[in-house]
């Protein structure tokens, strides 16, 4: 399983600390990759553009959370080859996460957390 940490220039320090927490829990450093906002031409081209979110018009900003949409590019980033854990840069490992892959099977290729019955995307496990 690869761990993909999404980030932008404002979140580099946090993402390095997150990576270190996964390494400390036994994930090899070569299994930790960064999804970089600054390297994504498509997302960068959308800065300043309008989009619809929850029924309201918003402007896409290059801000603290500009990396958010990178999470949906994780499977393509690893060429659809394996299971991946996609996390925000402020998510840290308190134990080795390898056992969570058991949430995925032939019927479930995506797992995430829920808050108040709503799916969250800060931590997503994907069978790419």
For the regions a language model picked out, list residue spans one by one.
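Glycosyltransferase catalytic domains, chiefly GT-A lineage
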Residues: 1-128
